[in-house]
Amino acid sequence: MTLQIGVIGCGAIGQDHIRRLTRTLSGARVVAVNDIDPQQARDAVTKYGLDAEIYGDGHDVVAAADVQALLVTSWGPTHEAFVLDAIAHGKPVFCEKPLAVTADGCMRIVEAEVAHGKRLVQVGFMRPYDEGYRALKRVIDSGEIGAPLMLHCAHRNQSVGERYTTDMAITDTLIHELDVLRWLLGEDYASAQVVYPKKTRHASAHLADPQIVLLETVSGVRIDVEIFVNCQYGYDIQCEVVGENGIAKLPDPPAVGLKHAARQSVEIMTDWKERFIASYDVELQAFIDGVRAGALTGPSAWDGYAAAVAADACVRAQRSAAVEPIAMAERPAFYRG
């Protein structure tokens, strides 16, 4: 069976997913598209040679009889309504982050999915599909380094645009760590604090950069995450887990070591899409395979909710300079195990 997918949102990430659906992945084809800018939708159909219907309203894509599953890559504030509509139609939906722009919105999706009685939602957190993170989790789960005590992490971008704001360091950048570190450790967060080092001269006047986020999990693991989005030298993701008996570190992407002109160097990537390109392929293939098998296994609506609750606390901590509690609702039995 070839899964027939409708895509809502044909901007950069939407077209990137359309590209992989048509040229890289197997078992699916795009049969319907929509974008708030009709020309974007037409361009996607032409660029990728799609035999797909163009709809003026994303909700019409959800309702289309030939659409079996949805891919939501539209503007963030529209995600909640489209995902809820997909659940109401009983159609599986892959939703890029954020699942919703508020934790309350995420909870509405959780409640709708639980009421439906079957998992239909996968959230576009791709780092759990990265082979480096998977290898790191295997080491942690093996017990080789003992119980994790501390994590030292960094999320560095070469630069960001003028429209990037201080809170986006949480909602657009740290959100990936909030998801993947919770997955690595297998436990939720208890509190968050944000501190501000000396500001880089490369940051816009309205942007606090860098920032350090201090997290504590429910078992007492301490996590520090450096967010530095104007680091200049490249795109660099670091994660070191300090355990009772040893240390495990996220491997850097493979690169050729160069010795030349009395120098030794290794190239550092500058594009976040290049760093995790394989992970995007694997996560979307997992969605296709899960829908066809009748059982989704990727990041759930509950994971989207958990990330949103933690992000809200971090944004509060940015403003209060205090340690902010992270209080989640009780996890429904639907999402356990």
Curated annotation (Swiss-Prot):
Family membership: Belongs to the Gfo/Idh/MocA family.
Self-association and partners: Homotetramer.
Function: Involved in the oxidation of myo-inositol (MI) to 2-keto-myo-inositol (2KMI or 2-inosose).
Organism whose genome encodes this protein: Burkholderia vietnamiensis (strain G4 / LMG 22486) (Burkholderia cepacia (strain R1808))
Gene Ontology terms, MF aspect: inositol 2-dehydrogenase (NAD+) activity; nucleotide binding
Catalytic activity reported: myo-inositol + NAD(+) = scyllo-inosose + NADH + H(+)
PANTHER family: INOSITOL 2-DEHYDROGENASE, PTHR43593
Highest taxon in the source lineage: Bacteria
One GO-annotated biological process of the protein: inositol catabolic process
Keywords carried by this UniProt record: NAD, Oxidoreductase
Protein's UniProt name: Inositol 2-dehydrogenase
Cited Pfam families: GFO_IDH_MocA (PF01408), GFO_IDH_MocA_C (PF02894)
Phylogenetic placement of the source organism: Bacteria, Pseudomonadati, Pseudomonadota, Betaproteobacteria, Burkholderiales
Record-listed E.C. numbers: 1.1.1.18
Signal peptide: none
